[in-house]
Amino acid sequence: MNSLFKKVTSSIFFLIIMLWASAQQPEVQVLTSGTKTSLRGLSVVNDNIIWVSGSRGMVGKSTNAGKTWKWMKVNGFDTTEFRDIEAFDGNTAIIMGVGEPAYILKTSDGGDSWKLVYENKTKGMFLDAMHFIGSNMGMVIGDPIDKKIYIAETMDGGDTWKEWPVDKRPVADSGEAFFAASGTNIRLFRDKKFYIVSGGTRSRLFTSSAITELPIVQGTESTGANSIAVYDDGDLKGSKRMVVVGGDFSADSSRVKNCFYTSDGGKTWKKPATPPHGYRSCVEYLDKNNLLSCGLNGVDHSKDGGKNWEWISKESFHVCRIAKSGVAIFLAGNNGKIAKLVWK
């Protein structure tokens, strides 16, 4: 009898905890704003260390979960747009300047000084995004040059970069390119497995093994996929569960074909029953079922793997990222605006 009572009590307690957790609602809490920079680069190292990068050569860093921020203008790059950043700890980070010329810089002293590790003055060069797996292997992509998608990689933590040979680069269609919107149109995993989404007149998914069409809205330079999220259970191998978002940034309230999800690696794509509430520049898995997406007219949350999206904030953001090690989720956007997702 005593054993049965304990089992029943334990089951009731577990049910109460589950009901409490399901009742929690995500809320966007703005932490800081007012800086004259558009933030598109965001790297959340852990629950305390966050780096951001943006226009006017600006980089920001917090080491106390976003309570206070240190702002730095990179010396000699006052007008450069750093649209992506990858940070590894409170001292080490890499920033990507889009072009022309294109730059990649690295700091090892918390942003006090920066070393130029890559420069490309090729006409038409425009870097769009980069992604790292661990602290050594990384990949950067850029708009097509002579119809060949630009790709370079590093195996030493960004100290040196090796460009892919032209004959190994994927061929882009006329009017097909990438959006330097949030640094999340590329996802990299172990064994150099990658996922890249394009936009413009044609929108496709490029992987290390295939190229497939995307059903997202496309056909003009303002349309197409902006971001891809690939679910990973922690082994850094990725999975077949993916979500793609985008739309038309010239019609930021349009919900027409702005989001699709797949559970078979992109062989088939499904449209959400309730799509995000407009153009979205970034999407991020929070866990297997919960996702966050943001754009010019607000933030959406999905708790069923991307099948339905709830508009939880009308605050504008370019990018949202979850901590590499931890559970904290941050967002960044125009006018130096940075926010944190909290559960109420």
Regions found by a protein language model. Name each.
Residues 1-27:
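Bacterial Sec-dependent N-terminal signal peptides
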Residues 24-344:
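Residue-level hotspots at or immediately adjacent to binding/recognition sites across diverse folds
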